[in-house]
Amino acid sequence: MRGAMLALLTFALSLATFIEVLDSTVTNVAVPSIAGSLAVSNSQATWVISSYSVAAAIAVPLTGWLSQRIGEARLFVWSVLLFTLTSLLCGMAGNLELLVVCRAMQGLCSGPMVPLSQAILLRAFPPERRVLALALWAMTVLLAPIFGPVLGGWIIDQFSWPWIFFINLPIGLFAFAACAALLRREPPDPHQPPMDVMGIVLLVVGVGALQGVLDLGRDHGWFDSSLIVGLSLIAALALVSLLIWESAEPYPVIDLSLFRDRTFSFGVAIISLGMVSFSVIGVIFPLWLQTVMGYTAFQAGLTVAPLGILALVFSMLVGMFLDRFDARVVTSFGFLVFFAVLSWDAHFTLTMSFWQIVTPTFIQGIGLPCFFIPLSAAILSRVPNEKLAAASGLSNFLRTLSAAFGTALSVTWWDNRAAHHYGNIAQSEIGRAHV
């Protein structure tokens, strides 16, 4: 595939990836609106987010196994179509219970979309242009979480919460039609390996319980809650059992042999740590703007959005010129930029203007593509073509799980520090009153 057809396929794959990643963040600002419309509490409305994240977390690592049984192109096309249809159902839901069920269905459909879009793009481009393909893919993965809160806030202000789901319909249908027309669907292998039933059960139970801990832990006081303790024990037992089972299973649902490649293992470890850091600043910064500086969700989103400008530009530059530089140098440069911006952010004060806050955020857009694109290229650089879908699914699962860890830990840390400082202020005021 070349020329206009390759460009159209790249555009369609990018759109599908964009709406999937966007949908995982756009609902964050819609919780109060959903709660008010459906007459439930804010904590109950957060199940709209949790149900999606749990279902997606279960589906992502199954991508490689499903691709073997169904075919990559067929699985991707059907995932896009079902994701679009479940978006329609989410927007039409008239009560919280139905909305949560539809969001869980949407999460299951979304799981294969991001890893398969990466694998299909890499296979469509010639080897010498794979870094450019990864740069195009990384742009959508990096930019969607940045613009999600802005778009979500604007849609809710101008229309109503169902439209954050309805907006997926034209985009999803176009991506489905284009991919269905352009992707060659190979017939499934008639000699299917036996189904790893035990592996699937352990994966679903372990990942579901772990994601439940991350989503519900803060609201239940973490390990002060018997629910969280129980879920943690279930997750630990199931995931340890999964590792033991899969290491001996001849036809595993998760291919642990990928970790024998040091490049894959090291790249996944570094990018996972990077996602923890990125998610921390991505959560704490808007939280500080809204709870301390008095910004609305939309204003906070506008403050973060400039990050996407330089990220877009440098994604293309890294994709075009990475082969002329040592990838380790580019990655280190991206990390140093990110570290410098974090140090800058640490000195923010309550008297800073909008533009003083935006400037370091804008500069941060240089570091993100320089860090993530070379690592994404390295992770898959030595993976055989027949294992690309499995490797992409596994690396994306660990990346997403790391972001969930970072989000849960950062919000808990924020709440604890806020309670500590508010307590000090209260004690100070009491002391003054007695004087």
What are these regions (language model features)?
Residues 6-64, 98, 160, 198-199, ...:
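Transmembrane core module of solute transporters
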Residues 44, 174, 399-434:
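Hydrophobic transmembrane architecture of multi-pass small-molecule transporters
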Residues 44, 129-136, 387-394:
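Cytoplasmic loop-to-transmembrane helix junctions
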Residues 60-199:
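Helix-loop-helix hairpins in multi-pass membrane proteins, especially solute transporters
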Residues 115, 136, 141, 145-153, ...:
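Glycine/proline-centered helix-kink
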Residues 170-188, 204-216, 234-248:
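C-terminal membrane-cytosol helix-exit motif in multi-pass small-molecule transporters
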Residues 177-197, 244-253, 350, 416, ...:
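Helix-loop junctions on the cytosolic side of multi-pass membrane transporters
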